[in-house]
């Protein structure tokens, strides 16, 4: 039986068709989604898929590649979008190579901040034709060359703050003809080259936190006629004659153009004062002011100028997807949160991430409105730039702040320097809550009540230099949470309590130089971001790293000079810390005071091994100063000393603060010292030589004795000289007197030894008691040939003696009056002569040579006296005849050893030996060249005693 299929109902058919349609729709949606994603990825590029998130808004793509650890740009690819912002901050880029951005033609904003970029090679920015903003902040750039920014012809905003730039070449910005905003704050610029901004239409320039001392008008300021905002704070301005042109130029521009203050750093007499409050006479007191005045022409109108509000209301530049528009206000320099360095001037971030509008334009003004209320003893003016009242009460002999009547209404700046204020009370500043600057320098403040500044919550600068403050405590700075600059130099501070600076977390500059500090408590700088610290001229011997130095992580300047640093093991940690500082951070040298081997030496030039032989075991953190007891101050400080506005003594005058000596004066002083040293050395040399010669002369004089010369009556030996060629006079005992014979200088009678004085009974010829032996001690050194009677008789048999006449007594020598006293008072009494001898023949030497006795046996008074025939001459030693003309002397003394005494009249025949010896031919006397004295033998019947006394000869002591 045939059965039929059940019929399909209409309902089922509709259900089937609907199911099929849903499947097709789902498949189409999935396919469309896949195709859309693929198209999107292909449209933005690989950089948005793998490396960085991308966001499109208002037709601009923002590519966020921040903090991705990117080392090289080759790790990413350019996005495929017409206009985009590329954010590469917080990476590890250290160098930009040529043509690295050649494919990034769509970039309008490029963030390269917070990298480690040290160099930008020529052509690195080629391809960035559409770039309008470039951020290079927080890198390590040191130089901006002429070709650094080639290819950035459309650049309008350039930020290169927080680098180490010290040199900018003259044409570095020459091709940036559209540049309007230039941020160069917090670098190491000490000057700007001429014509740097000649072709740059700058409207905003930030030069804060550099090392600028001058800004010349010619070549620099004259090209900045379009500037509407200028920031020059935190530079060491030298308020001298050269700054008059800057003062004139600032007076000629809009009142609102200068944001902040130009505060004088030098000279010391103007330290801490605003340039607009210093007169030209104070800037240039001794020169013609007109030579330095360079007034630019006043702009006709301010049309097109964009005026800004003060720095306190400026916004921070941040990354944004908004398109850059010229009418919008450019942002200020930024700082990444992970960077320790901060802005010197506080800047409040804007609520939105875009650009804030410029403030409304104001009419060009050159005079400030008249202030409403001002204390009677002070002068006041209103500053339009910050809408604050400046109260100037300097040098008004004010003894108390309460004397200021009427009270100024909400002053912005108060100058109370050079007064007699001794105490700061808690009620002194109750009505000054808006105070931004308070200058109490160079007063007599020794006491500040606790929380005296508690109401000054907006105070940024506080000057307490040049007072008598001895101790710092946390209560002293209570309420100063906005304080950025604190000047405490030239006080008597000996102690800083722990936590003193906790109430001032925003402190950036701290001057503690020229105090009596010897230690710093642990954690004293905890929580601070100090940029500049001055500890010069204190009593520090070392500073611990742990708890003190290691907390100074944001420093851009520190001064440790002129402290008695003890360069031993305790300072090794500080040395290592100093060596890790970047170039330019340490202001001056760190000179060792002890130990002596390192004195006046820079600590950095000494190896750690020399400072501490076992420095590897030394802990980097030296003992904390809390354990060091601060002794009483060693130097007395006179309370009546007046200090000038810098805190230095007022007696120093304009240049009193300069401790260095001018180079010309130093060179002249060194030259004078050198010349004096030469003269002193020459004088000492001459003195030493004279003393040496005197000592030698004294030694010679002690070995000399005076011997009197005398004339002896004698007869000339016969013969005319014999065959020997040497004439010997033959003595005749009878016959006519012969004329005087002139003997040579070496005749024996000119050589009279000292003991001849004993032939006379005059006491002047006697030897002094106790020196009878010493007088003849050196006789053997003369080596004079002598012979006894016994030897002569053996050599030649004398002729039979003639009849001897009656012997005449020996002649008595007479002294001139005063001769005895003269001999007693002087050792050198007669011209000095040298005695030369010739070695005698060995067969003529006497066997009786003795150092303790004088010549013996020379002329023995024997009984066998004989005469020598006429014409017969002895070969060497002629014997004296026993004639009346010959004298035989019998000594009346006995020559003994040193322990014996002389006794006249001794009976021993040995003692009757005469002291006169026969003349050896080898003995002669040579007079000195300075004196000439020829002794002549005279043939007289009686001796000439006056001539005997005049002709004296000095011989070496025997």
From Swiss-Prot:
Residues 317-358, 789-844 are annotated as: Disordered. The keyword Glycoprotein applies. Residues 797-812 have a biased composition (Pro residues). SUPFAM superfamilies: L domain-like. Expressed predominantly in the cerebral cortex of the brain but also at low levels in the spinal cord and medulla. InterPro entries: Cys-rich_flank_reg_C, Leu-rich_rpt, Leu-rich_rpt_typical-subtyp, LRR_dom_sf. Its main location: membrane. Suppresses neurite outgrowth. Belongs to the SLITRK family. This is SLIT and NTRK-like protein 5. It comes from Homo sapiens. The gene is SLITRK5.
């Amino acid at each position: 039986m045939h059965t039929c299929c059940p019929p399909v109902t209409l309902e089922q058919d509709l259900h089937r068709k609907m199911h099929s349609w849903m499947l097709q729709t789902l498949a189409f949606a999935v396919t469309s989604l896949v195709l859309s994603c693929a198209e999107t990825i292909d449209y933005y590029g690989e950089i948005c898929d793998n490396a960085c998130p991308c966001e499109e808004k208002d037709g601009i793509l923002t590519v966020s590649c921040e903090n991705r650890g990117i080392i090289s740009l080759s790790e990413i690819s350019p996005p495929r979008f017409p206009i985009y912002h590329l954010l590469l901050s917080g990476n590890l880029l250290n160098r930009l190579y040529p043509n690295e951005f050649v494919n990034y033609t769509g970039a309008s904003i490029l963030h390269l901040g917070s990298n480690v970029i040290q160099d930008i090679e020529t052509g690195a920015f080629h391809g960035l034709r559409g770039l309008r903003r470039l951020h290079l902040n927080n890198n390590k750039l040191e130089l901006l060359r002429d070709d650094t920014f080639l290819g950035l012809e459309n650049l309008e905003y350039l930020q290169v703050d927080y680098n180490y730039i010290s040199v900018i070449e003259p044409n570095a910005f020459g091709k940036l003809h559209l540049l309007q905003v230039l941020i160069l704050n917090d670098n190491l610029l000490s000057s700007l080259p001429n014509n740097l901004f000649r072709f740059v239409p700058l409207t905003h320039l930030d030069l804060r936190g550099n090392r600028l001392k001058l800004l010349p008008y010619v070549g620099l300021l004259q090209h900045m006629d379009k500037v509407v905002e200028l920031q020059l704070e935190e530079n060491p301005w030298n308020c001298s004659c050269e700054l008059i042109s800057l003062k004139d130029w600032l007076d000629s521009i809009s009142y609102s153009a200068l944001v902040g203050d130009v505060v004088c750093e030098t000279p010391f007499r103007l330290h801490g004062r605003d340039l607009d409050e210093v007169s030209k006479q104070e800037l240039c007191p001794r020169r013609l002011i007109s030579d330095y005045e360079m007034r630019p022409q006043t702009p006709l109108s301010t049309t097109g100028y964009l005026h800004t509000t003060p720095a306190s209301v400026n916004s921070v530049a941040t990354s944004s997807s908004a398109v850059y528009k010229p009418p919008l206000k450019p942002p200020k320099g930024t700082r990444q949160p992970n960077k320790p360095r901060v802005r010197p001037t506080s800047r409040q971030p804007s609520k939105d991430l875009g650009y804030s509008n410029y403030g409304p334009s104001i009419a060009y003004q050159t005079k400030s409105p008249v202030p409403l209320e001002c204390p009677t003893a002070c002068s006041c003016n209103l500053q339009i730039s910050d809408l604050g009242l400046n109260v100037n009460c300097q040098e008004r002999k004010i003894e108390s702040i309460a004397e200021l009547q009427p009270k100024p209404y909400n002053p912005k700046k108060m100058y109370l320097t050079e007064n007699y204020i001794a105490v700061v009370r808690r009620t002194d500043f109750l009505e000054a809550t808006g105070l931004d600057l308070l200058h109490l320098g160079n007063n007599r403040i020794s006491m500040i009540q606790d929380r005296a500044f508690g109401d000054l919550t907006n105070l940024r600068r506080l000057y307490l230099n040049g007072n008598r403050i001895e101790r710092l405590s946390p209560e002293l700075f209570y309420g100063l949470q906005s304080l950025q600059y604190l000047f405490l130099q030239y006080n008597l501070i000996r102690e800083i309590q722990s936590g003193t600076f906790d109430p001032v977390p925003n402190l950036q500059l701290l001057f503690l130089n020229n105090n009596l500090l010897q230690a710093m408590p642990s954690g004293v700088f905890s929580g601070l971001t100090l940029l500049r610290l001055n500890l010069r001229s204190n009593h520090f011997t070392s500073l611990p790293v742990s708890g003190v130095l290691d907390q100074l992580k944001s420093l851009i300047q520190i001064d440790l000079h002129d402290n008695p640093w003890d360069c031993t093991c305790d300072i090794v940690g500080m040395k290592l810390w100093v060596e890790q500082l970047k170039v330019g951070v340490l202001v001056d040298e760190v000179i060792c005071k002890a130990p002596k081997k390192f004195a006046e030496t820079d600590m950095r030039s000494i190896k750690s091994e020399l400072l501490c032989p076992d420095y590897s075991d030394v802990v980097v953190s030296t003992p904390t100063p809390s354990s060091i007891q601060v002794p009483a101050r060693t130097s007395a400080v006179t309370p009546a000393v007046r200090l000038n506005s810098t805190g230095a003594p007022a007696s120093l005058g304009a240049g009193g603060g300069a401790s260095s000596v001018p180079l010309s004066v130093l060179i002249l002083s060194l030259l004078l010292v050198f010349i004096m040293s030469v003269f002193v050395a020459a004088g000492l040399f001459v003195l030493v030589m004279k003393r040496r010669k005197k000592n030698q002369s004294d030694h010679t004089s002690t070995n000399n004795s005076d011997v009197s010369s005398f004339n002896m009556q004698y007869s000339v030996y016969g013969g005319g000289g014999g065959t020997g060629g040497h004439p010997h006079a033959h003595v005749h005992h009878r016959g006519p007197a012969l004329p005087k014979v002139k003997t040579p200088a070496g005749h024996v009678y000119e050589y009279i030894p000292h003991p001849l004085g004993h032939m006379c009974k005059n006491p002047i010829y006697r030897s002094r008691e106790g020196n009878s032996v010493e007088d003849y001690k050196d006789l053997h050194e003369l080596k004079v040939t002598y012979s006894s009677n016994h030897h002569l008789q053996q050599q030649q048999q004398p002729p039979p003696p003639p009849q001897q006449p009656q012997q005449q007594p020996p002649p008595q020598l007479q002294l001139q009056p005063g001769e005895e006293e003269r001999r007693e008072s002087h050792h050198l009494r007669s011209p000095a002569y040298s005695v030369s001898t010739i070695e005698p023949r060995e067969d003529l030497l006497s066997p009786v040579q003795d150092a303790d006795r004088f010549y013996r046996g020379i002329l023995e008074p024997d009984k066998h006296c004989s005469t020598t025939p006429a014409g017969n001459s002895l070969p060497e030693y002629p014997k004296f005849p026993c004639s009346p003309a010959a004298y035989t002397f019998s000594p009346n003394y006995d020559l003994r050893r040193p322990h014996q005494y002389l006794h006249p009249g001794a009976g021993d025949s040995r003692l009757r030996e005469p002291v006169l010896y026969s003349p050896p031919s080898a003995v002669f006397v040579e007079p000195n060249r300075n004196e000439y004295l020829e002794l002549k033998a005279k043939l007289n019947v009686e001796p000439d005693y006056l001539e005997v006394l005049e002709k004296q000869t000095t011989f070496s002591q025997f």
